[in-house]
A protein has these predicted regions:
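Short, polar/charged alpha-helical segment
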Residues: 61-84, 204-210
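Periplasmic-binding protein-like
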Residues: 50, 112-125, 144-146, 189-193, ...
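Beta-alpha junction/loop-to-helix N-cap segments that form part of ligand/metal-binding clefts
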Residues: 39-45, 60-64, 82-155, 164, ...
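Extracytoplasmic "Venus flytrap"
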Residues: 49-70, 96-102, 125-127, 192-201, ...
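Extracellular/periplasmic periplasmic-binding protein-like sensory domains
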Residues: 259-336, 347, 417-419
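Segments of small-molecule ligand-sensing domains
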Residues: 320-332, 343-410
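Short, low-complexity disordered leader/linker segments with a strong preference
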Residues: 1-47, 78, 84, 417-420
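Extracytoplasmic ligand/sensor domains, especially the bilobed periplasmic-binding protein
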Residues: 103, 118-220, 268-301
């Protein structure tokens, strides 16, 4: 049977239309499929918890930590955050003040874990961090800490807490060996430190390192947290006639007062301490008492190994809006770099699940950006850390670190130590 000519034309036109519609539909599907991994339809903010001393003698460290983590989070967000599937993730920082008090630190960590739902955390205070490390593991909360006590390392292999500060037990041998080589006429060392867990770790590590370096180790002097007058303790330690006095691990405010007291009592030897900046010490003690001091701070001097990102941090601290900003602190570079390790691990893992991020950190040979140093790399577990901690060495970061000499009231690089 013949089909009328008009009907044939209609059928042809309809077929052409259907083919065109199918092609457009397929093309749209292809475009949608290609963009689903890069275009997010959902936004989610991940809270990064920080428990640290924002007031009290250790506040310069705590404010440095809050600033460093916040600025690293800002940079993570500015670089595009992290898109996984149809969700775009950015970071925000929640910082709580523990005033370097164990009870406050414990309450803060519990609040962030149980009430605020934080899954990524930075902690500072020794006893609180130690006490709650098992809880954080049970709750699968990834925690980076700067606790000096090596018990934070002596955890099960599945622990979720990592020390991202080169603990003094790792640094002690190189620090004292460098002093011995650089100041060959100095033969003896004594420790003036806090009467707590942190102080005990400092004392034990120094004693072992002194023996390895060939330095005479004198009796340590301990003082209670909150001490305002250091005259009795300085008098006691000077009676031993040490060439080197070590105050590593002591709060910044205490180090400044000790330096001032040592100078007032005529000490002419070497005062060596930890991550304390010349600018903070200058405010407390003045220039003369801190001249020649050794610290583990990173001098923000251009033209060397220090990265441009870190060199720009002080100006960003001053310009940043909000309470507790407007001042640049000594150790912001360190906490900025530590936070960068965590955030780089998130990106490499392509996940905001702490379990997945932890697996990336634990991966053999994994390397992460260490922002303080040009082309800086950080790893967890190395010959240096494994030699001290054995199977637990994977919970200790290994990276290059500076020895700083204060000259004319300013930080200068004495040397950069690269762990073997």
């Amino acid at each position: 049977m013949k089909t009328p000519k008009g009907l044939t034309e209609v059928k042809k036109g309809l077929c052409s239309f259907l083919i065109l519609l199918l092609a457009v539909t397929l093309l749209a599907g292809l475009v949608t499929g290609c963009s689903s991994s890069t275009t997010a339809s959902k936004e989610q903010v991940i809270t990064i918890g920080v428990d640290t001393p924002l007031t009290g003698g250790a506040a310069p460290w705590g404010l440095s930590e809050m600033h460093g983590v916040t600025l690293a989070a800002d940079d993570f967000n500015s670089a595009g955050g992290l898109t996984i599937g149809d969700t775009h993730y950015t970071l925000k920082v929640e910082a709580l003040d523990d005033a370097y008090d164990t009870a406050k630190a414990t309450n803060n960590i519990n609040q962030m874990a149980y009430t605020d739902g934080v899954k990524f955390m930075f902690t500072f205070q020794t006893e609180g961090s130690l006490a709650l490390a098992p809880t954080l593991t049970n709750m699968k909360i990834l925690n980076f800490t700067v606790v000096n006590d090596d018990r934070i390392i002596a955890q099960p292999a599945d622990a979720y807490t990592y020390r991202t500060y080169m603990g003094f037990s790792v640094q002690a041998n190189d620090y004292l060996a460098w002093m011995k080589k650089t100041y060959p006429n100095d033969k003896s060392i004594a420790v003036l430190t806090t009467n707590d867990t942190n102080g005990n770790v400092t004392e034990a590590s120094t004693k072992a390192a002194a023996a390895a370096a060939g330095l005479t180790y004198l009796a340590p002097v301990f003082y209670d947290t909150g001490t305002a007058d250091f005259s009795p303790f300085v008098t006691k330690i000077l009676n031993e006639k040490p060439d080197i006095i070590l105050t590593i691990g002591d709060p910044t405010g205490d180090v400044g007062l000790i330096a001032k007291t040592l100078n007032g009592m005529g000490f002419k030897g070497i005062h060596a301490t930890g991550i304390v900046g010349a600018a903070d010490l200058l405010k407390i003690a003045g220039q003369a008492p801190i001249e020649g001091m050794l610290t583990l701070n990173m001098p923000l001097i251009s033209g060397g190994q220090v990265s441009s990102a870190v060199l720009g941090l002080p100006a960003r601290e001053v310009a940043h809006s909000g309470s507790a900003w407007g001042t640049a602190y000594c150790c912001t570079w360190d906490f900025y770099s530590e936070a960068g390790i965590m955030f780089d691990a998130m990106k490499q893992a392509k996940s905001v699940d702490p379990t997945v991020v932890k697996a990336k950190i634990d991966q053999s040979g994994a390397k992460f950006n260490y922002a303080a140093i040009n082309n800086g790399i950080a790893t967890f577990g190395s010959p240096a850390s494994n030699a001290i901690f054995g199977a637990n060495g994977g919970h200790q970061v290994t990276n290059s670190w500076p020895i700083d000499i204060i000259k004319n009231g300013k930080d200068t690089i004495g040397t950069i130590i690269t762990p073997k």
